[in-house]
UniProtKB/Swiss-Prot annotation:
A GO MF term: oxidoreductase activity
Protein name, UniProt field: F420-non-reducing hydrogenase subunit G
Gene that produces this protein: mvhG
Class in the EC hierarchy, top level: oxidoreductase
Keywords in alphabetical order: Oxidoreductase
Annotated EC: 1.12.99.-
Known role: Part of a complex that provides reducing equivalents for heterodisulfide reductase.
Pfam families, per the entry: Oxidored_q6
Species of the source: Methanothermobacter marburgensis (strain ATCC BAA-927 / DSM 2133 / JCM 14651 / NBRC 100331 / OCM 82 / Marburg)
Assembly information from the UniProt record: The F420-non-reducing hydrogenase is composed of three subunits; MvhA, MvhD and MvhG. It forms a complex with the heterodisulfide reductase (hdr).
């Protein structure tokens, strides 16, 4: 019998949801176990951080938030032959990446001093034996070389299981590369995705059946998001939030979506449309278009003017 492949998993700046998607392999987990053994997984097993063995494959969840994350990532890269960046936090920085809108010191002060849920009358900020925050959240691939990326918040378990099995069998791995709109079952109007208002879900109520959500005034990130999920959310009338990140052809997911919105409003064609009025309909532009990918954007953090 051939020697089994040694697999490890690690949880960095993430929420453990990606590890739950591994547990959700269900019976496919048995197929994985025929080819591999889990040798290291602090989330799923009673293993210690200081006992990282040599691994054939390591699946890493979460981005780089603090110096401990960086140290583990670098050690795992040394110990593993093949590194999978697993989940949107690892691939793009994820929701924790919105921390990049503030300085590190501002984040610490808000968490330990200003937060009403953290009684701290003496104003003590932990400093000893506590990992220090990086200057900004970074995708895993910005700190170490990764061999394959599986985005998703969390990744679909069936897709992830197929990726792992293909890897274990030495088969070629290929994920969908089209945008969400190309696989979405909702109908696009023949005149195009024109819109003249932006609404929130509660303002629309129940969207029209089978009609694309964008002409109904809803911000759906489908035009700027890769179709790995199969358009699960728009299929049940929930606008896509972009949790799988952009296609390989798109360098900046938020910029792509802003361009799509401008096109839907016909900003270039109709000179009576004021782009600033369009922007005013969005309360949180960064939080809307960069919810999951700010650390991987062309401008991955807030740039402050000198003196401000």
């Amino acid at each position: 019998m051939a020697e089994k492949i040694k697999i490890g998993t690690m949880w960095l700046g993430g929420c453990s949801g990606c590890h739950l998607s591994i547990a959700d392999f269900h019976e496919k987990l048995l197929d994985v176990m025929e080819h591999a053994d889990f040798e290291f997984s602090p989330v799923l097993m009673d293993t210690k951080y200081d006992e990282i063995p040599e691994l054939d494959v390591v699946v890493i969840e979460g981005g780089i938030v603090n110096d401990e994350n960086r140290e583990f990532a670098e050690e795992l890269r040394e110990k593993a032959k093949f590194v999978i960046s697993y989940g949107t936090c690892a691939v793009y920085g994820g929701i924790p990446g919105l921390r990049n809108l503030w300085d590190k010191d501002e984040v610490i002060e808000e968490a330990y001093i200003n937060s009403i849920t953290t009684p701290n009358e003496e104003g003590v900020i932990p400093s000893e034996d506590v990992p220090h925050l990086e200057g900004r959240v970074k995708p895993l691939g910005e700190v170490i070389d990764v061999d394959f990326e599986v985005p998703g918040c969390p990744p679909r378990s069936d897709v992830a299981a197929e990726v792992v099995m293909a890897l274990l069998k030495g088969e070629e791995i290929e994920l969908p590369s089209t945008n969400l709109c190309e696989v979405c079952p909702r109908e696009k109007p023949p005149e195009g995705l024109a819109m003249d208002f932006i609404k929130r879900q509660f303002e629309v109520g129940k969207p029209e059946d089978d009609l694309c959500l964008i002409p109904q005034g809803l911000i759906c990130m489908g035009p700027a998001t890769v179709s790995i999920c199969g358009a699960e959310c728009p299929s049940i009338a929930i606008p896509c939030r972009g949790c799988y990140g952009p296609t390989a052809r798109v360098e900046d997911q938020g910029a792509k979506m802003i361009s799509a919105i401008a096109s839907d409003y016909k900003v270039e064609e109709d000179k009576t449309v004021d782009p600033e009025e369009v922007a005013e309909q969005l309360d949180d532009i960064v939080g809307t278009f960069y919810t999951f990918t700010l650390p991987a954007a062309l401008i991955p953090m807030k740039i402050k003017k000198e003196g401000k």
